């Protein structure tokens, strides 16, 4: 598969086909090619001997997709940075990545960034001034060069930049198109922010098949009336989201085949797909295929998949996450470093061309999580699971990293920033489950000196500080105040005791 060439061919074959829609804004494949070519030409002219990654800032604007392709055509990996990411985190991403340039599809509110900022108006000027110029195809990202870098939660308090190469992305996209039976010219839901790698599951399978990406932004999701009005207009055929988002949509009685009559495929990734959610979807969309998938950011979106049928639902209360893609393999490793037999739990290790080359600028973290097995890259996921008859079953995290509403986060990172807040002496984050999946985060806090008369005022003050340091999805929903944190005999936080206390 030649990824960029496949996307480019639609600009020739179906130039007026819509590539991306967001509210009232849309771009065709012709415009996508012309503007990304113009941008790539400008980047190559402005930075002729440089291959540093480029930050791309915004939310669901069509210019985000143009910027992504412009970067890689000029030989630079892109780093998607969503508007919701706090200034402090954006600053740390800029410093860690070594980026020299930030392309903005929206107003940048972060100050003192160590990068050159190209504003929305600057971009329009570049698209106009360099229109008709084509970049040298030899400059484009290829092989084991980084295509994109996505920053995920890190236990040290600093986000980790996961490097995904061109070859990684080709491996994923080829598998997704073939195994999920995606067709030419379909409409794909684009719900996940671009800084979340679930978005890759719809972006590139859509673009290489001449599809249309239909973007739903966070404001729509916060206003169900707007959300369902948009969905009714969309004619979506391929639905890509976390199970949580689909579960929220199912609360609306009209969310069914009558709203989306041409729905063909549901693709789920990012968290556990509950049996009851899949069952409701089959009832509402009897003609659609439901695919449950699994994979960490470090292995390029997903590496397993299974068609969830009524027979599968009847057979498994907790759904399997699927069979491994053909060019990769799964190993279940026991604590002693040996491979577990069929049916025995251990750590899921992914081997093959989907695996990242490591964390940008973090050799120690890379060495800890990545290795080589039989000459191939391998990633130690930290996820517990087992394989039975070729099917992978996921059993949660081995450490304190969890997935909440599709977002992966390390509890230690949240604790790190919580303990740095004013009025906090000590703190532990306890993830609270509802059924099979995590529902919310509870912060157990030992408060420092403060003058607040009411606990809710103290909580508001702490949350205000956290909002400056962490994305909204990492802010604990509830706070509990105690005089001390229980400890185990060896001096570690007794998380099991805490969990039993707060759920009693």
From Swiss-Prot:
Keyword Aminoacyl-tRNA synthetase on entry: no
Q: What is its main location?
A: cytoplasm
- What is this protein's function? Catalyzes the first step in the D-alanylation of lipoteichoic acid (LTA), the activation of D-alanine and its transfer onto the D-alanyl carrier protein (Dcp) DltC. In an ATP-dependent two-step reaction, forms a high energy D-alanyl-AMP intermediate, followed by transfer of the D-alanyl residue as a thiol ester to the phosphopantheinyl prosthetic group of the Dcp. D-alanylation of LTA plays an important role in modulating the properties of the cell wall in Gram-positive bacteria, influencing the net charge of the cell wall.
Record-level GO BP terms? lipoteichoic acid biosynthetic process
**UniProt: ATP binding residues:** 152-153, 292-297, 383, 394-397, 492
Q: What is its EC number?
A: 6.2.1.54
Where does the protein end up?
Cytoplasm
Listed A to Z, the keywords are: ATP-binding, Cytoplasm, Ligase, Nucleotide-binding
Provenance organism? Bacillus cereus (strain G9842)
**Which residues are involved in binding D-alanine?**
197, 301, 492
Please name the CDD domains in this protein's record. Answer: DltA
Superkingdom, taxonomy of origin: Bacteria
Specify the protein name: D-alanine--D-alanyl carrier protein ligase
